[in-house]
């Protein structure tokens, strides 16, 4: 999950997936490095770059923001080397509210595409375009399995 490892994949002539949710940075520089270094091989005749990102869709933006609170609170706590889970949305929201002036919060909020189905789909399309990705992998997040499944259904159904 770096431009260097992406270039290595390109030199090997294989496909490449850039995991934004691990690297905590946009995939564009890595997909560009991959494409620039790509050499055809027995595996691939042409480059194929994918980006893996986090998304959460709900019926409304407000509901999606509410459902994203545990993920975001956990990510912010993780930046302080505090590994913790937030058992309720309310506890997570309280944690975020108490840290609303934390200068790292905007970066945490930007790590995932969160909103209504139409907003998330537009965000995913924009991400693919900006990154030069042939394909996106969506890591569905949410406080329950049902929430994650519903999110993917909403994204697919738009």
Give names to the regions the model predicted.
Residues 26-132:
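An alpha-helical appendage that flanks or caps ligand/catalytic pockets
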Residues 2-6, 24, 61, 117, ...:
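Residues at or immediately preceding the N-termini of alpha-helices
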Residues 29-37, 145-158:
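C-terminal helical cap(s) of enzyme catalytic domains, especially alpha/beta-barrels
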Residues 21-22, 139-147:
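Glycine-rich, proline-tolerant flexible connector loops at the mouths of alpha/beta enzymes
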Residues 2-25, 30-31:
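A conserved active-site cap/scaffold subdomain adjacent to cofactor or substrate pockets
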Residues 14-19, 47-54, 134-139:
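Hydrophobic faces of well-ordered beta-strands that scaffold small-molecule active sites
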């Amino acid at each position: 999950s770096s431009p260097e490892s992406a270039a290595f994949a390109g030199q090997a002539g294989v496909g490449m997936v850039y995991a934004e949710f691990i690297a905590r940075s946009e995939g564009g520089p890595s997909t560009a490095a991959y494409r620039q270094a790509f050499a055809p091989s027995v595996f691939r005749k042409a480059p194929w770059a994918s980006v893996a990102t986090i998304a959460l869709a709900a019926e409304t933006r407000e509901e999606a923001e509410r459902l994203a609170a545990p993920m975001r609170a956990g990510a912010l706590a993780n930046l302080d080397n505090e590994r913790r889970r937030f058992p309720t949305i309310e506890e997570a929201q309280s944690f975020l509210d108490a840290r609303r002036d934390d200068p790292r919060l905007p970066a945490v909020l930007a790590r995932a595409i969160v909103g209504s189905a139409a907003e998330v789909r537009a965000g995913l399309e924009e991400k693919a375009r900006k990154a030069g990705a042939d394909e996106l992998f969506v890591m569905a997040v949410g406080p329950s399995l049902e929430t994650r499944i519903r999110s993917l259904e909403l994204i697919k159904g738009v």
